[in-house]
Amino acid sequence: KYRALVLKNNRNTEILFTIYLNQDCKISDLKNMIKNNLFFAAKLYPLHATTNSSSGVKDIKKMSKYFEFLEKNKIPLCLHGEHIHKDDDPYERERRFLEYELSWLVKNFKSLKITLEHITTKDSVDFVKSNNNIAASITTHHLLENTNTFLGDYLKPELFCKPIIKSKKHQKSLLSAALSGNSKFFFGSDSAPHLKNYKFTESCCAGVYSTKYSISNILELFYSSKKTNNLNKFLTINGCKHYNLKFDNKLISYVRQKDFKFQKYSKFKNDSLINYNHFKNHWIKN
């Protein structure tokens, strides 16, 4: 029903559907879905790693039959890369995931196409560079924010997300990877719309709603860094190549507007969504 609803409201966009992979999935169902071309990739969340992951996987190493199935059928595996344990520091979860889960995964399933989504650390950048069957997506907010902007003078709940925003050292590594044009890194917004009442509250939801200004922020980042020659690689080419997708050669031009008045909130039902934006300048389609 959800797939039908999305397609009904689609406007000339190729929608790549993913399944929520966990230990309750049946291989027979996956076979039938592949036969009917119902999904493109599988997404795996560790249990309780982030918002809406209460049906996630407790022990990845017990999922071998699913990884074998994905590998055999050339289905990409997309990962939220955090090791979840009650004693783990939230700032160490991504590094520990590389050590305990991902190292095992790439070693035992060498032909499985893996995407480590929304990476946040230098450790992940180095890991992706050193392994052949894996690439990574990077979000706008993890490129542009760090612990100083998130937790510095004031706590900004609108920047609270999972994996949590890291230090300048890690931010610098993410920026270097994105701006370099390296084919193993590409844009992934991980945009998560949560109502204002659920963000500015005692126990706020994890997620940054970046959709409205993501492309503008990425354009300004590459422009101000004098790396526009690598912009298309990060935004379109690298991701398409990783997933073996054709990309449209049509060019879109943008114009830079200085001191643009940004819309902080977007009304939604009886509440509003908090739009993420970093720069004062804005890029609009020409």
Stretch-by-stretch model annotation:
Residues 1-34:
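A metal-dependent hydrolase metal-coordination microenvironment
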Residues 1-6, 101-102, 217-219:
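Short, well-ordered amphipathic alpha-helices
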Residues 9-14, 104-113, 224:
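Short, surface-exposed connector motifs at secondary-structure boundaries
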Residues 15, 42, 114, 190, ...:
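Conserved, mostly hydrophobic/aromatic
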Residues 21, 119-120, 234:
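Short beta->alpha linker loops
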Residues 25, 29-44, 52-187:
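Histidine/acidic residue-rich metal-binding segments in metalloenzymes
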Residues 107, 180-246:
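His/Asp/Glu-enriched, well-ordered alpha-helical/loop segment
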Residues 215-286:
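Mid-to-C-terminal alpha-helical segments outside catalytic/metal-binding sites
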